[in-house]
């Protein structure tokens, strides 16, 4: 509540004449300006201490004390100009000075919470975090980008062997221009992907078997055969139109009996071979005379050298052939005479008319066949048909599906 200290009766009269409203409007405008100034200069206001605000308040109180004396002097001087005194602007100074301390206090109260937040413990800044222990940076591992040819070769090798040894991996790496570690990591990832796909296939086929109608299960050795029927394969069949009865084929006439083959005459047995009588022993061949040694040939006489060939004498130079006379131009012959057209061809005379063929004997009618027995009526065919039942085979090793369902 505002105190009336330092105000005179004329000030109270001014308030009754709506002067106070103008002052309040001015104070409101001043409040808006100071609030904007306070927002703009937070750092400056925060640095100021409370004793400075106290000294400002005391100075303002001192000015308030000096204002009533001026008003009293003005009242003592005379009240012959009341309208001029109402319009004098200095009268608003006491009001403004009186209103300023509460505004400063209000501004101080508004600015104190940010000041406490600024003066309070702050989070660690850049230099402090730099001094503290920092976690080591994780280096991002570079992924190998395989080409289409490398992937195709790796997939083909994986189809043959899922666990290649060191020698096979080194050969494959040298052929594909890769390192052995990269090939080993690729096979590990490929085996994990293969196992994951097997689990997905197992769950998918298990769900399909659960949805099927209750059927028997055939167990045979290490393979479990489970019939699986997919309800989505049930289709609605169009009712078939009745077909005309099919006439039966007449039975074939019996064939004449085959003439039996005459029996072959028996083969006479071969006479036994007469035993060879033991003859006298072969006389040994006497050795012939020894061959006389061939005498050596006499040495060949050396062939005498041929006499040197006499050089062929060069003939006289050939005289140049003189050019002959130019060929005479063949004169053009007379134009060819046009062949006159020949006489027209005489038409061929018509031949004698063809004699009609005599009619042949009439064809004998075919004898009627035996009557056909009527076919039994067909059973009713339902309009809704089911797809054929599929048999899924899966090898089971130690209660684990080792291969996908086929």
UniProtKB/Swiss-Prot annotation:
Subcellular location: Cytoplasm; Nucleus
Chief subcellular location: cytoplasm
Stored InterPro entries: HD (IPR001356), Homeobox_CS (IPR017970), Homeodomain-like_sf (IPR009057), Paired_Homeobox_TFs (IPR050649), POU (IPR013847)
Region (Disordered): 1-21, 33-142, 341-364
SUPFAM superfamilies recorded: Homeodomain-like
Entry protein name: Homeobox protein ESX1
DNA-binding region (UniProt annotation): 139-198
SMART domains, alphabetized: HOX (SM00389)
Compositionally biased intervals (Basic and acidic residues): 74-83
GO BP term (any one): negative regulation of DNA-templated transcription
Sequence repeat segments: 244-252, 253-261, 262-270, 271-279, 280-288, 289-297, 298-306, 307-315, 316-324, 325-333, 334-342, 343-351, 352-360, 361-369, 370-378
High-level lineage: Eukaryota, Metazoa, Chordata, Craniata, Vertebrata
Molecular-function GO terms, alphabetical: DNA-binding transcription factor activity, RNA polymerase II-specific; DNA-binding transcription repressor activity, RNA polymerase II-specific; RNA polymerase II transcription regulatory region sequence-specific DNA binding; sequence-specific DNA binding; sequence-specific double-stranded DNA binding
Ranges spanned by the short sequence motif Nuclear localization signal, renumbered to the chain: 138-143
